[in-house]
Amino acid sequence: MKLLIALLALVTAAIAQNGFGQGGYGGQGGFGGFGGLGGQAGFGGQIGFNGQGGVGGQVGIGQGGVHPGQGGFAGQGSPNQYQPGYGNPVGSGHFHGGNPVESGHFHGNPHEYPEHHGEHHREHHEHHGHHEHHGHHRH
């Protein structure tokens, strides 16, 4: 068992080096939006834990890949977050297979994105429409 634990520790170190937060960490959405949460290359990234899918498989938390329009598979990452010193193959924009997986940088609640708030408020306003009050006419 000790050998396995040591192996896991080594793999984890490799992940931190190669994938952890390299393409993700705010990802495409900046705000941590729909690219940061699932991250772009994220925790298992491309290399490391399990090769292709890493720790969280293909989609991670679900935000990274489910909303491609929001920066899911765009593979841009946040250029400011890329640390070139590592020289890792999973950098900002270089995703060999594009697994949006990251577990570590969760920027707030995935349900608290401004894009969604507008829709909910609009629904509420539509229901409270015109209430006509008809007076009682006394003859």
Curated annotation (Swiss-Prot):
Biased composition range(s): Basic and acidic residues: 109-121
Name of the gene encoding the protein in the UniProt record: sala
Subcellular location: Secreted
Primary localization class, coarse: secreted
Skewed-composition ranges (Basic residues): 122-139
Keyword Secreted tagged: yes
Keywords: Developmental protein, Secreted, Signal
GO cellular component: extracellular region
Function: Likely to be involved in the establishment of the head.
Signal peptide: 1-16
Keyword Glycoprotein listed: no
Region described as Disordered: 60-139
Species whose genome carries this gene: Drosophila simulans
Entry protein name: Protein spalt-accessory
Transmembrane segments: none
Compositional bias per record (Gly residues), positions renumbered to this chain: 60-75
